[in-house]
């Protein structure tokens, strides 16, 4: 009888195991097919391994010798600034590696509140709220703020995190053509029937280096009773006279309602994001923003690094001026050599090449010459608009800039991108 039960159990288990194995095999087949389609489309993203700290000069696994890095968001060079590193170490030692908690349980330390207050002062806003990343700040904002009675109007080339955040909310969604103020006005007219109208835009767009026309956006928002939201991830710390961002650059700091930005680019490059704006909005986000409520607090070391980075910025704008001068040096030399550089005078300098294979080949040959840049093609950018995105840092030397231009000219001629 015992043997019969064992046999019955074994027989009943066999079909279940077979079905499980069949489901796993099906999953593997689906995944391999999807991965192969990515490879076939030429959009596979490989990850080069850096074996040194981040900075203008790095070591890359598989590349001989030192490499000059021109593809980091390290606009001010603060990720390796000795005072920023020391601040992170001090905070780590005093406040520990992490909080093991969300903010509203036992995850708020004095350093979190101090940094939020410092961010609000920096942007001249009432209050600020920290998130693990700006992606979280963007996915948390719209759902918490907007209801089905409201409308959000978004630039078509906004960052993926803004797009995802808008998808999560119940507001009516309008998309206007990139930087097209006539189209935005038409959409604002159409959205007049809604309770709140929020215009959402990047301050500086990461693929093209162009800047949102905030003066015109704010004028239209005022005319049609709308609020203005700006993501300043590629502007905070270095655009504007004191690095406050595109709203300072364009003289509309008092007209932009909400700013989201990051601590993971110019402000030390560790991690973290934030929303800053009206105090009542920040209070609402603390109660309703899901990425804030259900994510661990920002680690103390990251808080310490970002706080010191802001101190350095508020003490002097010398590094901001240095980055601007080096950006101008690169752009002017590249244009004089015959390259087309997209965007305004922004440290994101897209070298427009058009052909995806050409962009990939030039980037590979640049690395062989000790210059680390990345090529971008469809679907990251439109078809026929492939480019190499060069990013300038305040800690690049003039010699670094000149060497990069020389390599571009040499490789460009080799591949027929220059005569």
UniProtKB/Swiss-Prot annotation:
Binding site for pyridoxal 5'-phosphate: 134-135, 206, 231-234, 262-265, 295-296
Residues that, per the record, bind substrate: 159, 389
GO cellular component entries: mitochondrion; nucleus
Any one biological process term the GO annotation gives: L-threonine catabolic process to glycine
Pathway: Amino-acid degradation; L-threonine degradation via oxydo-reductase pathway; glycine from L-threonine: step 2/2
GO molecular function annotations of the record: glycine C-acetyltransferase activity; pyridoxal phosphate binding
Modified residues (N6-(pyridoxal phosphate)lysine): 265
Co-factor(s): pyridoxal 5'-phosphate
Subcellular location as annotated: Mitochondrion; Nucleus
PROSITE patterns: AA_TRANSFER_CLASS_2
Superkingdom of source: Eukaryota
One Pfam match: Aminotran_1_2
N6-acetyllysine sites (modified residues): 45, 187, 383
N6-succinyllysine carried by residues: 45, 187, 326, 368, 383
CDD domains: KBL_like
Signal peptide, first to last residue: none
PANTHER family: 2-AMINO-3-KETOBUTYRATE COENZYME A LIGASE, MITOCHONDRIAL (PTHR13693:SF102), CLASS II AMINOTRANSFERASE/8-AMINO-7-OXONONANOATE SYNTHASE (PTHR13693)
NCBIfam families: 2am3keto_CoA, PRK06939.1
Biological function: Pyridoxal phosphate (PLP) dependent enzyme, which catalyzes the cleavage of 2-amino-3-oxobutanoate to glycine and acetyl-CoA. Catalyzes the second reaction step on the main metabolic degradation pathway for L-threonine.
Family statement drawn from the similarity comment of this UniProt entry: Belongs to the class-II pyridoxal-phosphate-dependent aminotransferase family.
Protein name, UniProt field: 2-amino-3-ketobutyrate coenzyme A ligase, mitochondrial
């Amino acid at each position: 009888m015992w043997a019969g039960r064992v046999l019955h159990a074994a027989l009943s288990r066999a079909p279940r195991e077979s079905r499980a194995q069949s489901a796993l095999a099906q999953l593997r087949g689906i995944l391999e097919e999807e991965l192969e389609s990515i490879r076939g489309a030429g959009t596979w993203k490989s990850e080069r391994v850096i074996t040194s700290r981040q900075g203008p000069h790095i070591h890359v696994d598989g590349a001989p010798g030192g490499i000059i890095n021109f593809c980091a968001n390290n606009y001010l060079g603060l990720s390796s600034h000795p005072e920023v590193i020391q601040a992170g170490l001090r905070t780590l030692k005093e406040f520990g590696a992490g909080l093991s908690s969300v903010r509203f349980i036992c995850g708020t330390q004095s350093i979190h509140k101090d940094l939020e207050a410092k961010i609000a002062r920096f942007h001249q806003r009432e209050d600020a709220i920290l998130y693990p990343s700006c992606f979280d700040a963007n996915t948390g904002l719209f759902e918490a703020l907007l209801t089905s009675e409201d409308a959000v109007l978004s630039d078509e080339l906004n960052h993926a995190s803004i797009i995802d955040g808008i998808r999560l909310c119940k507001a009516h969604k309008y998309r206007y053509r990139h930087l097209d103020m006539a189209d935005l006005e038409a959409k604002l007219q159409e959205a007049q029937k809604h309770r709140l109208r929020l215009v959402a835009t990047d301050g500086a767009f990461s693929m093209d280096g162009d800047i949102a026309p905030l003066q015109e956006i704010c004028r239209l928002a005022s005319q049609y009773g709308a609020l203005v939201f700006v993501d300043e991830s590629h502007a905070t710390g270095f655009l504007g006279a004191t690095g406050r961002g595109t709203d300072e650059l364009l003289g509309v700091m008092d007209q932009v309602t909400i700013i989201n930005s990051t601590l993971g680019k110019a402000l030390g490059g560790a991690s973290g994001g934030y929303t800053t704006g009206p105090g009542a909005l920040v209070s609402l986000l603390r109660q309703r923003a899901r990425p804030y409520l259900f994510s661990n607090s920002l680690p103390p070391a990251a808080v310490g690094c970002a706080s010191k980075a802001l101190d350095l910025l508020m003490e002097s704008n010398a590094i901001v001026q240095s980055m601007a001068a080096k950006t101008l040096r690169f752009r002017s030399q590249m244009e004089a050599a015959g390259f087309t550089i997209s965007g305004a005078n922004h440290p994101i300098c897209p070298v427009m090449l058009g052909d995806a294979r050409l962009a990939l080949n030039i980037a590979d040959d640049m690395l062989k010459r000790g210059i680390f840049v990345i090529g971008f093609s469809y679907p990251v950018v439109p078809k026929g608009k492939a480019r190499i995105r060069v990013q300038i840092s305040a800690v690049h030397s003039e010699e670094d800039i000149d060497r990069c231009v020389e390599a571009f000219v040499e490789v460009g001629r080799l591949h027929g991108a220059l005569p």
